[in-house]
Each structure stands twice: as C-alpha cells, then as structure tokens.
Regions:
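Residues that define the transmembrane beta-barrel architecture of outer-membrane proteins
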Residues: 40-42, 83-87, 127-133, 146, ...
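Repeated loop/turn-to-beta-strand initiation elements of outer-membrane beta-barrel proteins
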Residues: 44, 99-101, 145-148, 200-204, ...
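Outer-membrane beta-barrel biogenesis signature
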Residues: 20-68, 145, 157-162, 177
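Residues on the lipid-exposed face of transmembrane beta-strands in outer-membrane beta-barrel proteins
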Residues: 36, 48-50, 89-93, 103, ...
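Extracellular loop and loop/strand-boundary signature of outer-membrane beta-barrel proteins
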Residues: 33, 73-77, 118-125, 175-180, ...
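Outer-membrane pore/translocation modules
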Residues: 107-222
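Transmembrane beta-barrel strands of outer-membrane/channel proteins
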Residues: 44-52, 103-107, 150-156, 206-210, ...
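Outer membrane beta-barrel transmembrane domains
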Residues: 59-69, 216-316
Length: 316
C-alpha cells in the first residue's frame, strides 16, 4: 500500500490531489488562500494545478529500508517506486461573503513498479484516468470579518479501481487498491478553518479537515484521516508573495479483504515553502516544494523525498 493514502491532501480537498494530495497520493499542500475560498470576497475562481510526486524511498516505521539487504524471493511485497502526476481543475464559487462551494476534478497519471511476494522480478503498471471528484461547501458567516468557517462535503467514487499490472510476473493481476485512480468509496469531508492578518505585511491561516469513508466497495474501505495545516505569507509586495506552510496528516489503516491492512496508515508532517506571482489583476501563478519533516508509516510503504506543485488561478 502506497503512502499516498497518507499524503493528500488538504491539497486534494481544495485543489488536489489530491492533491487534499493531490488526489489520493502526494502532497498535503494548501496551495492558495483565495482559490480555496479562504477569503471574504465573492465570485468565481478557476484553478489549474499540476503535482509531481516521485515515491522512490521505501520506509518502515520512522526509518528507510535498504532494498539491497532484502534477499529475493521473500515473503512480502517489496515496492520499487511509484511516480504520480496529478492535474486538477478546481472550480470555486462564492455568491456572497458567507457561503461558497468548491469542486475538484482530478486527472491521475501514475506508473508503479514492485516485486510481489514470492517473485524475483519486478511487475509494472500504468494508470491514467479521472480520479475521485470532491465537492465541498463552506459557511463563514460566524463573525463580521468572515474569517472563521466550516466546510462539509463528499468525495465521490468517480475514479475507476480495476487497473491491473501491464508487465512482469503479475501481468493481468489487479494492482493495490491504494494505487488505483479511485478508491471506490464515498467519503464524508468535514473541516474548520480560520484566517487573518498578523499585521499589515503578514497574514496567516489554520485549517483542520477530517475524511471518513461512508461505505466500502469490493471489500475495501479507506482508513479515516485528519489533515492539519497552517501557513504564513508575506504581503508587502502584491506582485510577489512568498509563503511557508506546515502540513500534517494522520491516517488510520485501510480495512477489508482487498486492503493491504498491514502496509497502510501512518503520520506525515511536511514543510512547504512557495511563492505566488500576480500576472495581472485576475490571474496569478504559484509554485511550491514540499519536503518531509517527519514520516511514520505502518509496515512497508513508499515515500517521496520531495514533491513539487505549480498552478495558475483566475478570479472573475
């Protein structure tokens, strides 16, 4: 089971991912206050984002695993690597300062290579397709400043979950459910956030959001998760806005006969520096890099050394 069940993010919830994650794998980044609706302004916003996550590091617990020390064949799967590319269209609409809705439409491009239990050669897969769509409503009419809000919505099972290995000893066998473009489940999303200004040059946000599967599909149920995010940005120059985020995710194990229970779930904490550039009054571009500060995984899971995200946002 890939660490993507842990990663995804806040990013995938709002922009990604998925990102949350980039959809189901990758960064926990919240790439922009305004494109997420974390502002008191109304209107339409479109966001197009690309996330790149190269999961090349095999980890267990809080440490890395040297594949060279594992004699083959072995009695467990030894994953070799997973490269994830997510392209996500985000559509956000606020009819007024109190209410808003956000729709995330992800496209997943993923290559994966692993050595299955009992094998001595690697098997590979290639997955391309629409991921799980997310729709979130928000209400922020609790204060006169509209700076505190709640979020509620669903992750829908729009991505397929029947991809198989394309080459190697496992050709034709289904790949791990955690590697499929979709989970097959409908998930409930509940969150709370606050944003504001520290002074005339700095503002900040804090956010927590939980994700819980409401059902199971084909003997698989995604583990419940909690994302916690906070960020600070420097606003003195409106054309060039540097930003720093701290992102954390705690995920429980997946369950069901088709779940890799022993190799799912854990805790991730990441640091995410980035910058947003104003191209014109309505158009902004942004870029972020995310690096791990702490990783604790159950069993054996793949993790990235870093992730990268770029995107553009247009406000009507």
């Amino acid at each position: 089971m890939q660490i993507q069940r842990l990663c995804f993010i806040a990013a995938s919830i709002f922009l990604p991912a998925s990102a949350l994650a980039c959809s189901s794998c990758g960064c926990t980044l919240s790439s922009d206050w305004d494109s997420q609706g974390l502002s008191a302004s109304s209107g339409f916003r479109l966001d197009l984002r690309y996330d790149f996550i190269d999961q090349s590091q095999l980890r267990s617990g809080t440490g890395s695993v040297d594949r060279g020390n594992i004699a083959l064949p072995t009695d467990r799967e030894i994953e070799q690597g997973t490269i994830n590319r997510y392209t996500t269209l985000g559509i956000d609409y606020s009819p007024n300062a109190n209410w808003g809705v956000n729709l995330q439409l992800p496209y997943v491009d993923r290559t994966h290579q692993t050595i299955a239990e009992g094998d001595t050669m690697a098997s590979s897969s290639q997955s391309n397709g629409v991921g799980d769509v997310r729709i979130m409503a928000r209400y922020q009419g609790f204060t006169a400043q509209h700076d505190v809000g709640i979020q509620f919505g669903l992750k829908l099972p729009s991505g397929r979950h029947d991809d198989v290995f394309a080459s190697g000893p496992q050709t034709g066998e289904p790949i791990d459910r955690g590697l499929q473009p979709g989970s097959g489940t409908t998930d409930l999303l509940l969150g709370v956030y606050k944003f504001g200004a520290l002074n005339q040059d700095f503002d900040w946000f804090a956010q927590g959001i939980a994700q819980v599967a409401l059902d199971s599909r084909d003997d698989f149920r995604t583990g419940a998760s909690l994302n916690l995010n906070t960020g600070l940005r420097y606003m003195a120059n409106p054309t060039f806005t540097p930003e720093l985020q701290l992102n954390a995710r705690v995920s429980r194990r997946d369950t069901g006969a088709q779940a890799d229970v022993g190799n799912s779930g854990g805790t991730l904490i990441d640091l995410s520096p980035g910058v947003t550039a104003q191209i014109n009054r309505s158009l902004h571009a942004y870029a972020f890099m995310q690096v791990p500060l702490f990783q604790r995984v159950n069993g054996f899971q793949l993790a990235p050394h870093w992730t990268a995200s770029v995107g553009v946002r247009y406000a009507f």
